Amino acid sequence: MIKQWAFTWLPRPATAISASRGRRRSHRFVRQWGLHDLNKRLLAERGNRVIGGPFAGLVLTDLSQCEHIGPYLLGTYEMELHAIWAEVLKRPFKQIVDVGASFGYYAVGLARRFPAVPVIAFDTDWWARRAVRQMAAANRTPNVSVRGFCDPAWMASHLKPNALIVVDCEGHEGRLLCERPLPAFSTATLVIELHEEFVPGVTARIRAAFERTHSFAEINSRDTTAVKLQDSGLTFDELRRVSQEVRGPQKWFVLTPMETPAER
């Protein structure tokens, strides 16, 4: 109840505190569970370029390696969305907005795939903003700009028609996307990780806000398929552990606009 109140009435500090706490807890677990050492062995074998998935070739920098980097490196991260990304990456966009960018896997990965499109990466955690800048420099993506808190006022002032919006902001998604019905939303493609556990009712709120302008795909998380690598010094069990995400159940909405700017 307190967390829901904070996200509703104090979204800027609430999201910053939640993001920072979550990142510190995640980094601590990576070491406690032995995943940091497994990741280091995998990096020593395969290097620091992503070898699979929609963002193959992406360079993973030093700060990113504080995370459980195995799923990113192997291309198994959020593999439930791979088919979605295969379709999304075929479309033209005028702008890409990533809210809750973490270390920049999606923001910089998308910037490489759309080098002429401006990418704005938001994260309220100072560590994440630093990591995104490092990733953007290493991957030579000057089209990435990094910001802190994203709110409805920024969307109202800066969102362009035919944008791609990627949202993973720990319950802030309802306020960000539903508080102001913006014309630019009607032509945006959105990939939204839902956080019903933080803000009950946010799923229904987003559906109600966009059901007249978008088609919906609802994606549920599933177990990651372990990667098989040839000539690896890691055992099958180690490869399973290093390729799987440590997470609970997740759900995403993928919203596709029913019209394009040319049809308006």
PLM segments and residue spans:
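Proline-centered flexible-loop/turn and helix-kink motifs
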Residues: 115, 186, 212-215
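Conserved Class I S-adenosyl-L-methionine
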Residues: 207-220
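S-adenosyl-L-methionine
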Residues: 1-122, 127-135, 139, 143, ...
